[in-house]
């Protein structure tokens, strides 16, 4: 069945090229953009489990949009933080495109070549060298976190802001270095002494641990705390409500969870980025074999403040300053530090 499906898709591609002609140096063509997606299956494989109200849920929203707008057949696989390689292979046996969400799928570099008829999208990390059927999508979370740090420092009354990371790893620390730089930028700009404290939950799915981490930072004086720990962030929000400090959400606009304590969120538009990648592929603009950095200039990272009906703790003048900073980051006028090469 899978071989038949591949043959049919190839036939569509050949007919499309015959009708339109082939340009020199054109991107690798995909299926016809005019609705020829019947039978195209996209598998979403998440390293943890859905319900994180963050990256995984955002990726599922992107898949849902593909179903509604592009007519693909969806498969969803939750790894629950184990058996990542097995689940990648299971997905490849059933799908034409496999979207792997999480840095844990590093073996895609060796597994993808064994399934050359399948295209892969790896979210939140990149292969060490290009793989012809793998599109890496990395996010400039350091840039968005710079803005979050600036906001934290602007709102803080103690001059101490904090961050709870899921683990001491490059991806998480990329958030923290940007957050720290943004907080210090505000301090320098406004003559205010700012300190940044941090700790790590060393898990992503235990809100009780996240709560303990947040309380420990609050005990050090932090009155605004950035959660970068997936579902552990629920514990950070709970601690904020109990102890009377503010929190910043991550990856998705999380203000709706508790608008009274969550002042903003650092957003990574994971769902939109994978949707756009698949849509571009279907239109004949393939990026497989490359790494795509979704940065401030692309609009895939930024700040969310919830909707206008929610309590807004961030002053309008600070929001205006954040917009100016975002433009400077996008243009390269401000270069944000990173843990990534």
Residue ranges and their predicted role:
Residues 1-9:
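Positively charged n-region of N-terminal signal peptides that target proteins for export
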């Amino acid at each position: 069945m899978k071989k038949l499906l591949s043959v049919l898709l190839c036939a569509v591609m050949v007919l499309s090229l015959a009708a339109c002609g082939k340009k020199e140096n054109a991107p690798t063509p995909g299926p016809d953009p005019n609705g020829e997606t019947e039978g195209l299956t996209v598998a979403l494989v998440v390293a943890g489990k859905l319900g994180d109200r963050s990256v995984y849920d955002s990726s599922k929203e992107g898949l849902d949009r593909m179903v509604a707008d592009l007519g693909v057949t969806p498969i969803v696989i939750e790894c629950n933080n184990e058996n990542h390689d097995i689940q990648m292979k299971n997905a490849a046996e059933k799908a034409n495109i496999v979207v792997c969400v999480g840095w844990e799928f590093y073996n895609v570099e060796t597994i993808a070549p064994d399934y050359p008829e399948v295209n892969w999208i790896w979210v939140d990390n990149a292969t060490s060298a290009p793989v012809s059927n793998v599109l890496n999508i990395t996010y400039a979370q350091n840039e968005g976190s710079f803005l979050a740090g600036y906001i934290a420092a602007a709102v803080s009354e103690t001059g101490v802001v904090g961050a709870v990371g899921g683990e001491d790893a490059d991806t998480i620390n990329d958030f923290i270095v940007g957050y720290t730089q943004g907080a210090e930028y505000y301090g320098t700009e406004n003559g205010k002494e700012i300190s940044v404290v941090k700790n790590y939950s060393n898990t992503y799915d235990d809100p009780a641990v996240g709560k303990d981490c947040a309380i420990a930072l609050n005990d050090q004086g932090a009155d605004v705390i950035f959660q970068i720990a997936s579902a552990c962030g629920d514990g950070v929000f709970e601690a904020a409500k109990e102890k009377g400090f503010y929190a910043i959400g991550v990856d998705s606009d999380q203000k709706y969870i508790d608008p009274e304590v969550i002042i903003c969120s650092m957003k990574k538009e994971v769902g939109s980025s994978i949707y756009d990648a698949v849509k571009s592929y279907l239109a004949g603009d393939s990026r497989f074999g490359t790494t795509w950095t979704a940065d401030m200039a692309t609009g895939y990272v930024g700040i969310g403040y919830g909707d206008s009906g929610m309590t807004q703790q961030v002053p309008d003048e600070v929001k205006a300053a954040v917009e100016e900073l975002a433009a400077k980051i996008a243009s390269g006028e401000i270069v944000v530090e990173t843990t990534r090469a």
